[in-house]
Regions:
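Gly/Ala-rich beta-loop-alpha elbow adjacent to hydrolase catalytic centers
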Residues: 35-39, 43
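Gly/Ser-rich "nucleophile elbow"/oxyanion-hole loop immediately N-terminal to the catalytic nucleophile
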Residues: 1-34, 144-145
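Short alpha-helix in the alpha/beta-hydrolase fold that links the catalytic acid
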Residues: 88-98
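Active-site signature of alpha/beta-hydrolase-fold catalytic machinery across serine-
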Residues: 45-49
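C-terminal catalytic histidine-bearing segment of alpha/beta-hydrolase fold enzymes
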Residues: 99-146
Length: 146
């Protein structure tokens, strides 16, 4: 479905979900976001567009433009797959921008795994990396959303 939708409309749909959660009484006033692959890129974009997010956890997602990093206020927990050269090529510049702008972040590169290591419906699934990344994610959410 996402391949047939206009990218701006698709991103606006994700952003509408964030805005819904910001008004949702059970959200306790704090909203965080996570996403995988394309959704990881959405998570990074949301961190720029919604500085009021409580936290952001992208899994192997395209990084936001380095020029936009100053807008990020949410603490970031970033998960990368060592063998994912396409996504990882943007990481050094993104990390430099995060450091230069004194952003709160932690980043993990999981050794020997590829893009999609958390997706248990594909051959790229790596249970130990997925479990560790998910434990870290839940801890991050507990820290920033509780």
């Amino acid at each position: 479905m996402s391949l047939t939708m206009h990218p701006t409309k698709l991103m606006n749909d994700f952003f509408a979900a964030i805005e819904f959660m910001q008004r949702y009484p059970q959200a306790a006033g704090k909203v965080g976001i996570t996403g995988f692959c394309y959704g990881g890129g959405v998570s990074n974009a949301a961190a720029v567009a919604y500085p009021e997010l409580a936290c952001t956890v992208p899994f192997y997602g395209r990084q936001a433009p380095t020029a936009d990093v100053a807008k990020i206020e949410a603490p970031l927990l970033l998960h990368f797959a060592e063998l994912d050269t396409r996504i990882n090529e943007g990481w050094p510049a993104y990390e430099a921008a995060l450091k230069a702008n004194n952003k709160v972040y932690e980043a993990y590169i999981y050794p020997g795994v590829n893009h999609g290591f958390h997706n248990d419906s594909t051959p790229r699934y790596d249970k130990s990396a997925a479990d560790l990344a998910w434990q870290r994610t839940l801890k991050w959410f507990d820290k920033y959303l509780s």
